[in-house]
């Protein structure tokens, strides 16, 4: 499907520039409302949507615009205020609502924002519904008669409901007593959620990145900037550090030694724990960028590994296609579909903590069978429209390099989607091998 407005993760951009303007977002809400109202005319009753947001200052403006758009189309609106993206997915499903909407740009700076939709089941909106919304955007905006306008109200118990849901994904037989955790909320949507979840399960919690001011989301804190977390873990002598991004769908973990563990390693750990608990795990899904050491480690324990395109949307699609439950990305998007319908940083952290409790081991101990392969990435600038896939010199160089890796490394070459650059990535057991192979391929491209 060719999308005019919807990208792989909703509608996103810089605030004040198309399409993230108040007038467009109001029209987007109205168009989505018309699509939902049409579905309701087939006997489902008047539709109600849930709207949540992260802590960006533009969230107030865009929330008001969405509210106006939906209610003008005859759709009722429930407003949660700041709440993690996966919390909106959960509550949409739990409250039996028609759809959920999140105002967030995830890990991006505060001056970006976006609109993301969830279906009634808490899943991403189907492509055909996105297509209907885009078609409705091309129609004139007509307000419903006064008797048919929607109502809007705030729900005050949304944080508490979501906190209890998160806790329900942690084994009843376990608690977190005796653990000291540093929790970095990125000054984002988890600031008033994550610390409570871990505290109520018994942990001693030191919260950082939990003072949002509308402009500091993801600024020097959170999953994309773990430096402050590493410092705090060492300063407080904590057992672990947990970092979430602005909308709390990503997770990065730091151990007591200050070592950072990414999503690839955490995916392997969760798979191993499910197996240790007696659950069958047929396979797991990563992406084109997942470290090969994780793929090989999973194969050693009899778990099939499949690579999807980069993006949690594509990981989810592959999991659903194969009826598997576990997948993720190195960035920290982890999917545990036996616990939640979408990626959830807090729920993922609880799965990691459950594995530590069940095993009695440290993170390093649980992952001693996985030593990530070194990666070498070289960006080669090319002319716009350059056809690297037909480049004879690159093909010849690849024919030499790949046999040398002998199944203990890999080559990934792809064009950037945003600039005239071809990215050459080589992964190998030894850094020198990766460096040499990447340079060979890059030089062939430049020739």
UniProtKB/Swiss-Prot annotation:
Textual note on the cofactor: Binds 1 Mg(2+) ion per subunit.
Phosphoserine carried by residues: 106
UniProt EC number: 5.4.2.10
InterPro entries registered for this protein in UniProt: A-D-PHexomutase_a/b/a-I, A-D-PHexomutase_a/b/a-I/II/III, A-D-PHexomutase_a/b/a-II, A-D-PHexomutase_a/b/a-III, A-D-PHexomutase_C, A-D-PHexomutase_C_sf, A-D-PHexomutase_CS, Alpha-D-phosphohexomutase_SF
Modification after translation, per record: Activated by phosphorylation.
Record carries keyword Isomerase: yes
Descriptive protein name: Phosphoglucosamine mutase
Organism taxonomic ancestry: Bacteria, Pseudomonadati, Pseudomonadota, Betaproteobacteria, Burkholderiales
Gene encoding the protein: glmM
């Amino acid at each position: 499907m060719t999308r005019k407005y919807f990208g792989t993760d909703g509608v996103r951009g810089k605030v004040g520039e198309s399409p993230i303007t108040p007038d467009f977002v109001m029209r987007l809400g109205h168009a989505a409302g018309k699509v939902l109202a049409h579905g309701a005319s087939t006997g489902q009753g008047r539709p109600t949507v849930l709207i949540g947001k992260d802590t960006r200052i533009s969230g107030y403006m865009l929330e008001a615009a969405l509210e106006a758009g939906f209610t003008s189309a005859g759709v009722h609106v429930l407003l949660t205020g700041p709440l993690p993206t996966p919390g909106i997915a959960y509550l949409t499903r739990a409250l039996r609502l028609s759809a959920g909407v999140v105002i967030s740009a995830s890990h991006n700076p505060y001056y970006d924002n976006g609109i993301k939709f969830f279906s009634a089941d808490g899943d991403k909106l189907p492509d055909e519904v996105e297509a209907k919304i885009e078609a409705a955007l091309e129609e004139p905006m007509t307000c419903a008669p006064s008797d048919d306008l929607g109502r809007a109200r705030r729900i005050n118990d949304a944080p508490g409901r979501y906190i209890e849901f998160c806790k329900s994904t942690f084994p009843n037989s376990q608690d977190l007593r005796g653990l000291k955790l540093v929790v970095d909320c990125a000054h984002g949507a988890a600031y008033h959620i994550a610390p409570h979840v871990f505290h109520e399960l018994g942990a001693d919690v030191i919260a950082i990145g939990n003072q949002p001011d509308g402009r500091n989301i993801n600024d020097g804190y959170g999953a994309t900037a773990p430096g402050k977390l590493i410092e705090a873990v060492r300063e407080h002598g904590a057992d672990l550090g947990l970092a979430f991004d602005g909308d709390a769908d990503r997770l990065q973990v730091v151990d007591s030694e200050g070592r950072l563990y990414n999503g690839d390693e955490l995916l392997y750990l969760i798979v191993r724990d499910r197996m240790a608990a007696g659950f069958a795990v047929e396979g797991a899904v990563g992406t084109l960028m997942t470290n090969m050491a994780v793929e090989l480690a999973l194969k050693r324990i009899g778990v099939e590994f499949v690579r999807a395109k980069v993006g949690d949307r594509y990981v989810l699609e592959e999991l659903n296609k194969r009826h598997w439950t576990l997948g993720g990305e190195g960035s920290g998007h982890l999917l545990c579909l036996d616990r939640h319908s979408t990626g959830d940083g807090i729920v993922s952290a609880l799965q990691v903590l459950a594995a530590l409790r069940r095993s009695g081991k440290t993170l390093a101990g649980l992952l001693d069978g996985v030593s990530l392969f070194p990666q070498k990435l070289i960006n080669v600038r090319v002319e716009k429209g350059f056809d690297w896939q037909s480049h004879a010199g690159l093909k010849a160089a690849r024919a030499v390099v790949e046999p040398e890796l002998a199944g203990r490394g890999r080559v990934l070459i792809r064009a950037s989607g945003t600039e005239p650059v071809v990215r050459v990535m080589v992964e190998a057991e030894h850094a020198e091998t990766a460096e040499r192979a990447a340079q060979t391929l890059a030089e062939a491209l430049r020739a």
